[in-house]
């Protein structure tokens, strides 16, 4: 048997109440001194409602207390005693169940608090991951937009490259055609007007000097005379544009200058006594005739 207030094992003396509960002597004194209420059913108790009992009576007390009692009363007393015992066991089981339920409730509260904290952490992590996913989606969208722009730029650059390749091929073909036309045979050149070397002979023959009349047809002394034959002026090469063949050759545009000044009669090469026409003709055949030379710096005359 256990006390219904402190649930300790009862040994020896105990206190029984009229409401059917069993208390130890210490708890009974506390109840009487405080509010005088039963801790189980809250019934008001007084000293008349309590009675001391012996939880472990000896044989002498059992024989003396049961002597002279009818069996009906004994059976009734035994029934009440058994019901009291069953009630005490039920109270004891209920106390144990309440204690276990309290412990389980406490554990559940601790687990609930722990899992609530974990759930909050998971929810916080989920919110962070959701924000990160949004940022990643925006980054993917920006990268897709950049990829599309780069593809458009690449297509434009490819189109420009194809156009440049076509222009390069066209210029290369034009250059090859110009190169082939530049190495054409000499019969395609324009003829250049040759100066008349004997244009001044009649004027010389009309001179009053008989010596000059005899030597009027003689050519000049072999050798170069810069004062008589000046080199033709150089044609300025235009640097304003590429080489064009459609504008015409330099020989076609400007004819070489011809010296039309009257030449001075040359001195006789074979002596001063040669006054006849046969000697002059002989000297003309023997002596080389000076012809104008082309300048190396003159541009090529071709079509």
UniProtKB/Swiss-Prot annotation:
It is found in: Nucleus; Chromosome. It comes from the Eukaryota. It catalyses: S-ubiquitinyl-[E2 ubiquitin-conjugating enzyme]-L-cysteine + [acceptor protein]-L-lysine = [E2 ubiquitin-conjugating enzyme]-L-cysteine + N(6)-ubiquitinyl-[acceptor protein]-L-lysine. Disulfide bonds: none annotated. It is an enzyme of class 2 (transferase). Expressed in young panicles. Pathway: Protein modification; protein ubiquitination. GO terms for biological process: chiasma assembly; homologous chromosome pairing at meiosis; protein ubiquitination; reciprocal meiotic recombination. Its EC number is 2.3.2.27. A zinc finger (RING-type) spans 3-42. Residues 201-268 are annotated as: Disordered. Residues 119-184 form a coiled coil. Interacts with ZIP4 and PTD. Ubiquitin E3 ligase required for class I crossover (CO) formation during meiosis. This is E3 ubiquitin-protein ligase CCNB1IP1 homolog. It comes from Oryza sativa subsp. japonica (Rice).
